[in-house]
Amino acid sequence: REEMVSKVAAITKFNIDQFAYMVKKMAGLPEGDGTLLDNCIMLWGSGLEDGNRHTRQNLPFIIAGRGGGTLNTGRFLSDVSGNQGDLLTTLLSCAGVPLDRPIGIATKEISELRVAGK
Protein backbone atom coordinates (compact mmCIF):
# COMPACT_ATOMS: atom_id res chain seq x y z
CA ARG A 1 0.00 0.00 0.00
CA GLU A 2 2.76 2.51 0.91
CA GLU A 3 4.53 1.77 -2.36
CA MET A 4 1.39 2.55 -4.36
CA VAL A 5 0.77 5.77 -2.42
CA SER A 6 4.38 6.78 -3.10
CA LYS A 7 3.97 6.11 -6.82
CA VAL A 8 0.74 8.10 -7.03
CA ALA A 9 2.37 10.95 -5.10
CA ALA A 10 5.28 11.00 -7.58
CA ILE A 11 2.89 11.09 -10.55
CA THR A 12 0.83 13.85 -8.96
CA LYS A 13 3.97 15.88 -8.23
CA PHE A 14 5.13 15.52 -11.82
CA ASN A 15 1.75 16.64 -13.14
CA ILE A 16 1.48 19.66 -10.84
CA ASP A 17 5.06 20.65 -11.64
CA GLN A 18 4.14 20.63 -15.35
CA PHE A 19 1.04 22.71 -14.64
CA ALA A 20 3.10 25.22 -12.63
CA TYR A 21 5.65 25.42 -15.45
CA MET A 22 2.91 26.25 -17.98
CA VAL A 23 1.33 28.84 -15.67
CA LYS A 24 4.70 30.54 -15.17
CA LYS A 25 5.46 30.55 -18.90
CA MET A 26 2.03 31.96 -19.79
CA ALA A 27 2.33 34.63 -17.09
CA GLY A 28 5.52 35.83 -18.81
CA LEU A 29 4.03 36.19 -22.30
CA PRO A 30 2.63 39.66 -23.02
CA GLU A 31 -0.78 39.79 -24.69
CA GLY A 32 -2.89 42.91 -25.08
CA ASP A 33 -2.92 44.91 -21.84
CA GLY A 34 -1.79 41.94 -19.77
CA THR A 35 -0.37 38.47 -20.24
CA LEU A 36 -1.47 35.32 -21.98
CA LEU A 37 -2.37 33.93 -18.55
CA ASP A 38 -4.63 36.93 -17.87
CA ASN A 39 -6.66 35.98 -20.94
CA CYS A 40 -6.79 32.22 -20.37
CA ILE A 41 -8.39 29.73 -18.01
CA MET A 42 -6.34 26.71 -16.97
CA LEU A 43 -7.67 23.87 -14.83
CA TRP A 44 -5.76 21.17 -12.98
CA GLY A 45 -7.39 18.63 -10.76
CA SER A 46 -8.40 15.13 -9.98
CA GLY A 47 -11.58 13.22 -10.64
CA LEU A 48 -11.23 11.45 -7.29
CA GLU A 49 -10.86 12.68 -3.73
CA ASP A 50 -9.54 9.30 -2.57
CA GLY A 51 -8.26 6.86 -5.18
CA ASN A 52 -8.62 3.83 -2.91
CA ARG A 53 -12.25 4.45 -2.12
CA HIS A 54 -13.04 6.15 -5.45
CA THR A 55 -14.85 8.97 -3.67
CA ARG A 56 -15.77 12.06 -5.67
CA GLN A 57 -16.59 14.60 -2.98
CA ASN A 58 -14.30 17.53 -2.18
CA LEU A 59 -12.37 17.20 -5.43
CA PRO A 60 -9.09 19.12 -5.53
CA PHE A 61 -8.87 21.66 -8.37
CA ILE A 62 -6.52 24.51 -9.17
CA ILE A 63 -7.68 27.22 -11.55
CA ALA A 64 -5.13 29.58 -13.08
CA GLY A 65 -5.71 32.57 -15.31
CA ARG A 66 -8.25 35.34 -15.21
CA GLY A 67 -10.37 34.42 -18.22
CA GLY A 68 -10.05 37.92 -19.66
CA GLY A 69 -11.26 39.39 -16.37
CA THR A 70 -14.24 37.07 -15.90
CA LEU A 71 -12.74 34.93 -13.12
CA ASN A 72 -12.52 36.02 -9.49
CA THR A 73 -9.02 34.76 -8.65
CA GLY A 74 -6.37 34.74 -5.95
CA ARG A 75 -8.29 32.82 -3.31
CA PHE A 76 -8.70 29.40 -1.77
CA LEU A 77 -12.28 28.19 -1.80
CA SER A 78 -13.56 25.33 0.30
CA ASP A 79 -17.07 24.16 1.03
CA VAL A 80 -18.32 25.50 -2.30
CA SER A 81 -21.57 23.78 -3.14
CA GLY A 82 -21.65 22.23 -6.57
CA ASN A 83 -20.24 19.39 -8.58
CA GLN A 84 -17.59 18.88 -11.24
CA GLY A 85 -20.12 19.57 -13.99
CA ASP A 86 -21.00 22.89 -12.33
CA LEU A 87 -17.31 23.81 -12.29
CA LEU A 88 -16.76 22.95 -15.95
CA THR A 89 -19.96 24.71 -17.00
CA THR A 90 -18.90 27.84 -15.09
CA LEU A 91 -15.41 27.89 -16.60
CA LEU A 92 -16.72 27.42 -20.13
CA SER A 93 -19.27 30.17 -19.58
CA CYS A 94 -16.52 32.50 -18.32
CA ALA A 95 -14.55 31.67 -21.47
CA GLY A 96 -17.54 32.63 -23.61
CA VAL A 97 -18.26 29.11 -24.82
CA PRO A 98 -21.98 28.64 -25.50
CA LEU A 99 -23.43 25.37 -24.23
CA ASP A 100 -26.60 23.80 -25.60
CA ARG A 101 -26.89 21.55 -22.55
CA PRO A 102 -25.29 21.23 -19.09
CA ILE A 103 -22.13 19.22 -18.62
CA GLY A 104 -22.75 15.97 -16.76
CA ILE A 105 -24.98 16.57 -13.77
CA ALA A 106 -24.43 20.34 -13.70
CA THR A 107 -27.33 22.30 -12.27
CA LYS A 108 -25.87 25.80 -11.90
CA GLU A 109 -22.87 28.05 -12.27
CA ILE A 110 -20.59 28.48 -9.28
CA SER A 111 -21.09 32.17 -8.51
CA GLU A 112 -18.00 32.42 -6.27
CA LEU A 113 -15.79 31.99 -9.35
CA ARG A 114 -17.27 34.67 -11.58
CA VAL A 115 -16.46 38.37 -11.32
CA ALA A 116 -19.73 40.17 -10.60
CA GLY A 117 -21.28 41.54 -13.76
CA LYS A 118 -19.01 39.60 -16.13
What are the functions of these language-model segments?
Residues 1-118:
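Ligand-binding pockets and gating/stacking loops
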